[in-house]
Amino acid sequence: MEMTHYEKTPLIRQVFNNGKTNSWFYVKHEILQPGGSFKSRGIGHLIRKSNEEALSEGSGKLAVFSSSGGNAGLAAATACRSMALNCSVVVPKTTKPRMVKKIQSAGAKVIIHGDHWGEADEYLRHKLMAQESQHGSKTLYVHPFDNETIWEGHSTIVDEIIEQLKENDISLPRVKALVCSVGGGGLFSGIIKGLDRNHLAEKIPVVAVETAGCDVLNKSLKKGSPVTLEKLTSVATSLASPYIASFAFESFNKYGCKSVVLSDQDVLATCLRYADDYNFIVEPACGASLHLCYHPEILEDILEQKIYEDDIVIIIACGGSCMTYEDLVKASSTLNVS
């Protein structure tokens, strides 16, 4: 049986203890992807499509190269394993040892280089890939988020949601918002692509959630043009991109999306609460979106409307494997989370 680079994930109605007697929230569980996050969709799609093109051209199998702080590298490694491709991942020194082991266990060669993702990426592209090219190999560079083919892969999440709502006899006009966490804008861009393809981009607002300290989208919106962050300080390291993809920034304004910025303390509290409530461990990048389930007043405020009993909000639980429960407890203690 051929392995696939991504799976159709459950869309589950969940009741949150948030002071409301009804539940509006349907959660899309991307943590169940082969690579532990939504990144399996887009990165797997890029690798599969590029490999098929290389084979059709007679170039042979690709040598795949990924730079990542963790989740993108794991997605690349698991996708390559499903296609029997060699994969090299460069991670910065800040990457947790358990994440390095996860990527290695998925079959990739891991090189640790640089103090942050930018230095790891520079080394990957200008040293490792240059060396491989000299050997005559066909190489593929996998960016963590800023690639249109990756967005195309991520867009399948919207197709699935529409199909799953239909299976549950839920009409699309009942959907009042779709909530996702935003770092560099890869998932957000894919969602916009999927909504647009299904003629829903102007009908269903996307609520983009960031954490203070890596809120590059919100800061760009306030300035009126994309900015680059010199420092990334949030505990939600999977959202820590110094810039926002141009397509994401342009789409935000085009389709009237909404921006929310949360504190690290709020997000960590949600991660611990969600683990206690549902026995799911999510990292802060994922907890950012789930926070709105526990605090629907934030959602109503940003949408400037009440959410009623028959209304539905879709939450993308984007996944991620960068933190254990012990990591969450330790970070919460450091930040005095009550």
UniProtKB/Swiss-Prot annotation:
The keyword Transmembrane helix does not apply. The modification N6-(pyridoxal phosphate)lysine is found at residue 39. Its cofactor is pyridoxal 5'-phosphate. It catalyses: L-serine = pyruvate + NH4(+). It holds the Pfam family PALP. CDD domains: L-Ser-dehyd. One of its GO terms (cellular component) is cytoplasm. Its EC number is 4.3.1.17. It is an enzyme of class 4 (lyase). Keywords: Cytoplasm, Gluconeogenesis, Lyase, Pyridoxal phosphate. It is found in: Cytoplasm. Coiled coil: none annotated. GO terms for biological process: gluconeogenesis; isoleucine biosynthetic process; L-serine catabolic process; threonine catabolic process. Gene3D superfamilies: 3.40.50.1100. The keyword Acetylation does not apply. Its main location: cytoplasm. One of its GO terms (molecular function) is L-serine ammonia-lyase activity. This is L-serine dehydratase. The lineage of its organism: Eukaryota, Fungi, Dikarya, Ascomycota, Saccharomycotina.
